[in-house]
Amino acid sequence: MRRLLRDLVLTSLASLLTALPACASTPAQRGLIVFQQVCAACHGMDHVDYGDMAAFGLSPDAIRNWAADQQIPNGTDDNGDPKTRPATPADPILSPYPNEAIGRLANHGLLPPDLSRLAMTLHGGPDQIQRILLSYAPTPAGVKLDDGRYYNTALKWKHIGMPPPLQDGMLTYPDGTKATTTQMATDVSAFLNDVAHPHTAERRRIGLYVLTYLALMAILTFLLQRRIWKSRP
């Protein structure tokens, strides 16, 4: 019985420590870094607020600073010209392009898709996102692609309008994880999956509370049982 209680305590505490952002980063947390440093140059997440990134371990100060660096539409001035203001944590993570026309102009006529629900709407979900990111290849002889198209074997039509976004070592993970192309593709796919399914993070938080409760109850039960055993004649 003692061994069972001890194992329960150790297992619960181990799971608890694994779940804490301050102790160890998760693929989704690393994926947020990839989004910030790579994806956000062309893509937005209109259905996600900056403040939602707290679920991925981003501190309130980091959220405010990130948001404040972005300018979002804020009506027009007295001359009818568009105005902007710094974003706040309550604002959505908009596309970096001020309008669709400029977005298309900068990308050979194609508008980079919003990533809020991509892992939900794309056939194959996060696995397909990862495959696309890892399936760029040189264009075969005899195959001609239009300007702004890149050969990619993960797609039925074998081309995509997005240039290869990931390169080994292009960023540094704070937890020391090596930023290989495969690792970054795995991480950002996990992040986009969690973004598309926002209740996943909430379930993890609830699970963290449950694990904490179970660990404390196991310790109290163990101590109470020891006390009962010692009090026996």
Positions of predicted regions on the chain:
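Boundary at the C-terminal end of the N-terminal hydrophobic targeting segment
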Residues: 22-24
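Juxtamembrane/start-of-transmembrane alpha-helix segments at the extracytoplasmic/lumenal side
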Residues: 196-214
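Juxtamembrane interface at the cytosolic side of transmembrane helices
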Residues: 203-206, 217-233
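Extended, hydrophilic extramembrane loops/domains of integral membrane proteins
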Residues: 162-197
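Bacterial N-terminal signal peptides
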Residues: 7-19
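Mid-length scaffold segments of soluble, non-membrane domains
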Residues: 106-145, 151-153, 161
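C-type cytochrome heme c attachment motif
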Residues: 33-45, 94-98, 111-120, 131, ...
